[in-house]
């Protein structure tokens, strides 16, 4: 969440248009929209983005790397491009580039278009998948903790276990651990965790849960994240 941090639907990437309501479009689609007025999302606030074209192009390019029809299975969703994303309440003091939240029976991904990276998008996609897989019961805390050092518990200001975690941020929360493991595997590419057996096992477990839950009929033998298992 903090980064510099279902149904079979038809994927429609709408152009960057007006957005900001607290409900999602009733259309069965994933839309990409631009915030047009100041908004408080509950935990985060954001300003309108002056020009979201380059950010929208990056979002399209990232989504194109995922298997055909995959995003269609995430449910109704909205990717909202904003500017000056700020944390409030318990999120104060952080530098945020994006977050995801539930909106009714759908989801919303809010991205700061002024400092957007492909890694941030992959990271937030991992959060969406995490939620769906956890709800479906194919991803469990017990199974994941078995892949961590004995006696470990998530929290701030810990000594890094480089063999088990991508970075210190991954050690703060179980969901951030999964998102960073997924994101970094895509960034590094083939053989991402060849020299890190514990991270390889985490990616393998997350990847297996994804294939268990989703329809993979149109998928390649190896997805963009599974290349990290080579």
Language-model region placement:
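Positively charged n-region of N-terminal signal peptides that target proteins for export
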Residues: 1-4
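C-terminal motif of bacterial Sec signal peptides marking the signal peptidase cleavage site
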Residues: 12-15
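Bacterial signal peptide processing site
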Residues: 17-19
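Ser/Thr/Pro/Gly-rich low-complexity linker/stalk segments immediately outside membranes or between
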Residues: 22-27
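Acidic/histidine-rich, surface-exposed loop or edge segments in extracytoplasmic proteins
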Residues: 32-50, 162
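Zn2+-dependent metallopeptidase catalytic core
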Residues: 50-77
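Active-site-flanking segments in enzyme catalytic domains
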Residues: 74-230
């Amino acid at each position: 969440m903090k980064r510099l941090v279902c149904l079979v639907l038809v994927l429609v990437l709408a152009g960057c248009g007006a957005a900001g309501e607290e409900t999602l479009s009733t259309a069965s689609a994933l839309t990409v929209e631009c915030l047009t007025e100041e908004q408080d999302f509950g935990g985060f606030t954001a300003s309108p983005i002056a020009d979201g074209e380059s950010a929208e192009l990056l979002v399209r390019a990232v989504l194109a790397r995922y298997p055909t029809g995959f995003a269609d299975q995430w449910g109704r969703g909205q990717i909202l491009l904003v500017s000056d994303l700020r944390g409030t309440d318990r999120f104060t003091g952080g530098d945020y580039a994006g977050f995801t939240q539930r909106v009714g029976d759908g989801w919303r991904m809010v991205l700061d278009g002024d400092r957007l990276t492909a890694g941030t998008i992959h990271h937030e996609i991992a959060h969406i998948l995490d939620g769906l897989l956890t709800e479906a019961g194919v991803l469990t805390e017990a199974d994941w903790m078995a892949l961590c050092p004995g006696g470990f518990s998530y929290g701030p200001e810990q000594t890094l276990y480089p063999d088990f975690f991508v970075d210190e941020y991954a050690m703060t929360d179980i969901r951030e651990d999964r998102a960073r493991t997924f994101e970094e595997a895509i960034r590094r590419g083939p053989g991402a965790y060849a020299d890190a057996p514990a991270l390889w096992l985490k990616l393998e477990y997350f990847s297996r849960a994804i294939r268990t839950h989703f329809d993979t009929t149109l998928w390649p033998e190896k997805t963009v994240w599974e290349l990290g298992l080579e």
